């Protein structure tokens, strides 16, 4: 068994759910990746079971699916990104793949639903609901943001981390001690982060243009659009980026009904949602204007 998952809270949670229900905690079987990172599927065995959770594919990256199909792998593709929805719409031959493709809930929520045959998000564990509420930008739950910041205080929340095992065990035992502790830590972390980000934006945020749209930019990859605070409301788009030594990694965001972040990201080889997407480049074309 192999599992490829997206490199964010939702993807790691989805990977953790795979680990729990398959009882596979072998680190070598899990691969964290961004939208257009190279995937190690050439090393996968023929007829191997491969979970692709919270992971988007586009016209430029569907060759990975084709390779897995040629290898006669059992593919379980669970995803909620707009890019994936459009790919499946344009290529009905992929509809035969096992899994769930739906934009209604996050990748982690869909992964839980897949393994447990759960239909209603409210029947998912509380931690899954928080992850989905944040990742889909629904903000229907009071403590969602505090939970997100609290998770960032955890030194390791990869899919094999004990934090997920605690969450799941507490779900089945009908108590929420660990989640409550995470939320308490998140309240403190959020206040600290807001103060730091406000000063950081004051000194380093700048405005560029992305596909004809004014965009507020910050060289700070973690935190997403939340790093801008109220400043994000003044521009139709926002962008955070970081250089990893080889590539510039970009995340873009927008609440403008006329801006499709996934379409912009796909032009650069990436993908994602209408309101949030990502890609990477070898250069930095988004200069200050």
Region roles according to the model:
Residues 1-6, 215-219:
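Short hydrophobic beta-strand segments
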Residues 135-221:
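Glycine-rich, Lys/Arg-enriched anion-binding loops that position phosphate/diphosphate groups
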């Amino acid at each position: 068994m192999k599992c490829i998952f997206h490199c964010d809270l939702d993807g790691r949670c989805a990977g953790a759910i795979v680990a729990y229900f398959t009882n596979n905690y072998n680190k070598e079987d899990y691969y964290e990746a961004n939208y257009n990172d190279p995937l190690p599927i050439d090393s996968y065995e023929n007829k191997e079971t491969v979970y692709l959770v919270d992971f988007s594919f586009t016209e430029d990256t569907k060759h990975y699916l084709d390779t897995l199909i040629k290898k006669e792998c059992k593919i379980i593709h669970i995803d909620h990104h707009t890019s994936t929805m459009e790919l499946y719409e344009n290529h009905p031959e992929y509809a035969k793949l096992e899994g769930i493709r739906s934009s209604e809930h996050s990748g982690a929520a869909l992964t839980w639903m897949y393994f447990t045959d759960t239909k209603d998000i409210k029947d998912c564990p509380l931690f899954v609901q928080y992850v989905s509420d944040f990742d889909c930008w629904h903000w229907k739950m009071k403590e969602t943001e505090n939970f997100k910041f609290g998770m960032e205080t955890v030194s390791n929340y990869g899919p094999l981390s004990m934090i997920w095992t605690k969450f799941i065990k507490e779900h089945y035992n009908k108590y929420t001690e660990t989640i409550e502790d995470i939320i308490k830590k998140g309240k403190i972390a959020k206040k600290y982060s807001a103060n730091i980000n406000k000063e950081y934006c004051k000194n380093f945020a700048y405005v560029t243009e992305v596909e004809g749209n004014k965009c507020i930019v910050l060289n700070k990859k973690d935190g997403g659009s939340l790093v801008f605070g109220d400043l994000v409301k003044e521009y139709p788009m926002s962008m955070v980026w970081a250089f990893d030594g080889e590539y510039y990694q970009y995340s873009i965001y927008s609440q403008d009904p006329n801006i499709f972040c996934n379409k912009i990201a796909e032009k650069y080889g990436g993908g994602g949602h209408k309101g949030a997407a990502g890609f990477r480049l070898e250069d930095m074309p988004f200069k200050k204007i």
